[in-house]
Curated annotation (Swiss-Prot):
Keywords carried by this UniProt record: Aminoacyl-tRNA synthetase, ATP-binding, Cytoplasm, Ligase, Magnesium, Metal-binding, Nucleotide-binding, Protein biosynthesis
Source organism: Mycobacterium tuberculosis (strain ATCC 25618 / H37Rv)
Name of the protein in its database record: Phenylalanine--tRNA ligase alpha subunit
Co-factor binding comment: Binds 2 magnesium ions per tetramer.
Pfam families, per database record: Phe_tRNA-synt_N, tRNA-synt_2d
Family in the record: Belongs to the class-II aminoacyl-tRNA synthetase family. Phe-tRNA synthetase alpha subunit type 1 subfamily.
Reactions performed catalytically: tRNA(Phe) + L-phenylalanine + ATP = L-phenylalanyl-tRNA(Phe) + AMP + diphosphate + H(+)
Principal localisation: cytoplasm
Residue pairs linked by disulfide bridges in the UniProt entry: none
Signal peptide interval: none
Subcellular location per the Swiss-Prot or TrEMBL entry: Cytoplasm
Amino acid sequence: MLSPEALTTAVDAAQQAIALADTLDVLARVKTEHLGDRSPLALARQALAVLPKEQRAEAGKRVNAARNAAQRSYDERLATLRAERDAAVLVAEGIDVTLPSTRVPAGARHPIIMLAEHVADTFIAMGWELAEGPEVETEQFNFDALNFPADHPARGEQDTFYIAPEDSRQLLRTHTSPVQIRTLLARELPVYIISIGRTFRTDELDATHTPIFHQVEGLAVDRGLSMAHLRGTLDAFARAEFGPSARTRIRPHFFPFTEPSAEVDVWFANKIGGAAWVEWGGCGMVHPNVLRATGIDPDLYSGFAFGMGLERTLQFRNGIPDMRDMVEGDVRFSLPFGVGA
């Protein structure tokens, strides 16, 4: 088996069988027969062990050359058959571009975007304006101008994403409240604005929290505004989002940027048949220090503000048990909410 004639015969047989293989399955069987562990070429390699040491090197070169020749033939035939298979698939799955087009299914709009647009439409209809601000903020706008003390827990890295280097005093905004400051510095009074956007906090993603969430925040600054105006605005907002039977109530609370401050609860009949009071967000009269930080005399003007999370609003309004469904991008979650294929 180690003679040049025997090796040539084995290679010729392998190459002939390889050339005749007309499918990948047939070629696989040919490989097993002529290049596998029990093939003539494999047996020739095993026979090297019994040769005298002085003959083994030369014989080994002949065996390797023979196997390499057969392997090259196999590789070339494999590439050819794969190319033929792929070409056949392209022909079978080809599209005649001259045919009339078919309807392309529309994607599903994300329910958070739909809710944000509905909130915006609600306040625009009330005569309010939309305002925007950057997602990368400074401590000045995110904390200082909003009356946060220097030692407030919200400033800690366990709650806030800070941006390197440390002395840049930049961070990912933790709420949309910085838009209030930017708006009051840039616009003439009175101001009635609504701000909707992404905010960032170092929360773990779980059934009720997400590190990136959307917040809607309202701000009104004018002469003579009171808690009564705030309550009326909240009631109108609640009815727009939860139906005409929705009601709100407020409970005393503390926020650095409002005084007095309150938390807002909403009562409504949800989409799964229940009705209850649910904590919705925060609100209050704009703190005099916030007005002073933007050059407004708190003896002449007053204001109110409120903020709610859109994910939380959508979750309890629609009976969604797990907030993670909102961020996983599964179209099956979005389709039931409206526009989609």
